[in-house]
Amino acid sequence: MQAIILARQDAATGLLPASTAITVHGDYTHAWVRDNVYSIFAAWALALAYRREDPPLAVPLQASVVRLMRGLLTAMMKQSHKVERFKHTQDPLDALHAKYSTQSGDPVVGDSDWGHLQIDATAIFLLAL
């Protein structure tokens, strides 16, 4: 648990990187929305299981889930202006970004440089709130 989940979570933003690899194909240390949303549910489910079987182990996982949800929400709130535009245009260029810097929560690619329209991941995240 510590080595796989908690050690990889950024201390400042709470976001998890997609990987720790930087290869010729790209920098995978960024936080993808979909990966972080699924990580939220995985850590939450694990925390629920530990809460019943071994309560002291549940505490750091619960804190990890809160940090991760706050980090993702903060990254999305930095782009609130895009949400308003997207409501009117429904243009993928106005969609929330799909990947963020793990260290700052800021977008790491431009609006037209990546397929940002990931409404499914954003919707699941909002339901979890």
Locate each region found by the language model.
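Acidic, mature catalytic/reactive cores of soluble proteins
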Residues: 1-129
